[in-house]
């Protein structure tokens, strides 16, 4: 029996973690068991997901299955995008130059800053009264 070819990639953004599986197919994107256009409330987020495929010209070459946890929709879309880009690298190192040029291989390190004691938020201080 012939083995199924699969490529895996993991992406993170804010508090979201996405595990991506690429299999040769027709370009279907399934997120947590639901088509991507139904899972994400905004079509722009789905376009965001497709950026690595567009950059490498592989929109119709792979079926993508994603399991994503944590965070909100934007973080989940960002994590999925990075996961897809990393899975494409596993498929072929030739894609690296194109993905790097568009900035799709860089993990966005911006996360929420912690609240400090004595302050109302991460940086917001209580109102100061001179007298």
Curated annotation (Swiss-Prot):
Positions in coiled-coil regions: none
Assigned keywords, A-Z: Ribonucleoprotein, Ribosomal protein
GO cellular component, one term: cytosolic small ribosomal subunit
A GO BP entry: translation
SUPFAM superfamilies for this protein: Ribosomal protein S5 domain 2-like
Domain of life of the organism encoding this protein: Bacteria
Listed Gene3D superfamilies: 3.30.230.10
InterPro entries named in the record: Ribosomal_Su5_D2-typ_SF (IPR020568), Ribosomal_uS9 (IPR000754), Ribosomal_uS9_bac/plastid (IPR023035), Ribosomal_uS9_CS (IPR020574), Ribsml_uS5_D2-typ_fold_subgr (IPR014721)
Keyword Nucleotide-binding set for record: no
An annotated Gene Ontology molecular function: RNA binding
Similarity comment text for this entry: Belongs to the universal ribosomal protein uS9 family.
Name recorded for this polypeptide: Small ribosomal subunit protein uS9
Provenance organism: Mesoplasma florum (strain ATCC 33453 / NBRC 100688 / NCTC 11704 / L1)
Name of the coding gene: rpsI
């Amino acid at each position: 029996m012939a083995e199924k070819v699969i490529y895996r990639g993991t992406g993170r953004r804010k508090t979201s973690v996405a595990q991506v599986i690429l299999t040769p197919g027709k370009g279907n994107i399934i997120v947590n068991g639901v088509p991507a256009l139904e899972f994400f409330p905004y079509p722009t987020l789905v376009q965001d997901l497709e950026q690595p495929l567009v950059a490498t010209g592989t929109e119709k070459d792979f079926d993508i299955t994603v399991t994503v946890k944590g965070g909100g929709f934007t973080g989940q879309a960002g994590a999925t995008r990075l996961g897809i880009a990393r899975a494409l690298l596993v498929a072929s190192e030739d894609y690296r130059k194109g993905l790097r040029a568009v900035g799709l291989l860089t993990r966005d390190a911006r996360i929420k800053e912690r609240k400090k004691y004595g302050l109302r938020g991460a940086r917001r201080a209580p109102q100061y009264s001179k007298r």
